[in-house]
Amino acid sequence: MDFAGHLHLRAAPRAFGHTALTLQSFRAPFHLSKPYWDYDSRVLLVQVVNPTAGILAGDRIESEITVDAGAALLITTPSASRVFRMDAGVATCRQHFTVAAGAWLEVMPGPLVPHRGSDYRQSTIVELTRGAGGFFVDQLMPGRAAHGEAWAWRRLCLEFECRLDGRLLVRERVDQSGEELRALAELAGSGAAACFANAILIPGAEADEDWRAAVEGLHRDGAWVGVSALREAGWSIKVIAPDGAYLRETLRAIRAVLAEAFPRMRCDPRRL
């Protein structure tokens, strides 16, 4: 059975500066946990759960998330998203995030795990008004490496676009077979189980950049970490790690550094 699932959320400020979901609509394969308000970071944490086995051929899933001025929202998932083998067909995911001035949105799902023969295409568009902030992360694992199944998907297409006041900040696109992406991992010397992460940080307000040196200092044997400035505002952070555990620890270390400069990131995405 294939799904045409959707997730529609809107977050807005409420009494005492709390953030609440003023709109929530979802259909399989999406389900929401009970939101958690983090008093320290002043962020509403929402965990999106996929109660099905994973993503199958023919699935079409769509997310629309809006954060109003003065609200702060963290979206996460409890586990990896698995894209299963497809003898034919394709699965698609479209994501659209809108963040108003004075709002904050962090999207940090678990890693994407494409299985042998899968064909998955994901498009993400982020639209921010000046003064909005956010942190947007994508993680990719090479497949079921523990089962000897790595870099075996048929096609993987990941598109990401971020705009500030309508002006393009960054547009990225990966469209490769497993074998083609394996070559990049080998170039980095990260081995057959290499994992990738791509993060976009939009500060939203003036902040010192002492964090940059600390994040770049996480580049070491076993993990490649790079930081580059976007054309007008914000930063791109890229990570290549030798395995999933190393990637997870590196991302945790990056968030710990950033939380010192951006208090909204003090919310633990694994709190639920």
From Swiss-Prot:
UniProt KW keywords: Chaperone, Cytoplasm, Nickel insertion
Keyword ATP-binding listed: no
Annotated Gene Ontology cellular component terms: cytoplasm
Residues spanning the signal sequence: none
Gene that encodes the chain: ureD
PANTHER family tied to this protein: UREASE ACCESSORY PROTEIN D
Binding partners and assembly: UreD, UreF and UreG form a complex that acts as a GTP-hydrolysis-dependent molecular chaperone, activating the urease apoprotein by helping to assemble the nickel containing metallocenter of UreC. The UreE protein probably delivers the nickel.
Record-given protein name: Urease accessory protein UreD
HAMAP family: UreD
Family of this protein: Belongs to the UreD family.
Compartment list: Cytoplasm
Primary site of residence: cytoplasm
InterPro entries referenced in this protein's UniProt entry, alphabetically: UreD
Pfam families for the chain: UreD (PF01774)
Known role: Required for maturation of urease via the functional incorporation of the urease nickel metallocenter.
Molecular function in Gene Ontology: nickel cation binding
